[in-house]
Regions:
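Hydrophobic/aromatic beta-strand patches that form the interior of the parallel beta-sheet core
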Residues: 47-49, 77, 108
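A fold-wide structural signal in alpha/beta-hydrolase
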Residues: 75, 104-108, 113
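Catalytic nucleophile-loop/oxyanion-hole region of alpha/beta-hydrolase
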Residues: 88-89, 95-96, 109-142
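Conserved AMP-binding/adenylate-forming
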Residues: 80, 86-87, 91
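Short beta-strand element of the alpha/beta-hydrolase
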Residues: 72-83
Length: 142
């Protein structure tokens, strides 16, 4: 019996997945930092929060909002992707900044822990902790 029962029709899609090695990850990390423009944008308020995940570890969460907001607004939790192995890239931060400024919502941007250093389900639990934190702080996020 195989480890996972995967339908054979999906096997060709495996050819589109690039190999990710520890060397590739190590080379990419220096380029995956929050851009300085995040704190220099005159139209944006950015606050940093340390939130507690399921195992007691603290993760960083940025909250971005337009300085033009004056009424209650929705909140978007932005999970950057990266297959849960790559940190957020500059364009992820750019997307979140645009949501905050152009859509007029608060953006919660968690820096969840990544594989392979933190195995499943750590990254999912960190994302859920960010959701719970946003829910618990809904009044101040409005």
């Amino acid at each position: 019996m195989k480890k996972y029962a995967i339908n054979r029709e999906f096997f060709p899609w495996n050819l589109f997945a690039p190999p990710i090695s520890k060397k590739f990850l190590a080379m990419s990390v220096p380029h995956m930092k929050p851009p300085k423009s995040l704190w220099r944008d005159k139209e944006l308020d950015v606050t940093t929060h340390k939130i507690t995940s399921y195992d007691g570890e603290k993760i960083t969460c940025f909250v971005m909002s337009s300085k033009k907001l004056s009424t209650k607004t929705p909140c978007l939790i932005y999970l950057h992707g990266g297959g849960f192995v790559l940190e957020a890239a500059g364009y992820h931060y750019g997307n979140a900044m645009r949501y905050a400024k152009e859509v007029g919502c608060k953006v919660v941007f968690p820096l969840y822990r990544l594989a392979p250093q933190h195995p499943f389900p750590t990254f999912f639990e960190d994302c859920y902790a960010a959701f719970c934190w946003a829910y618990d702080h809904a009044e101040e996020l409005h």
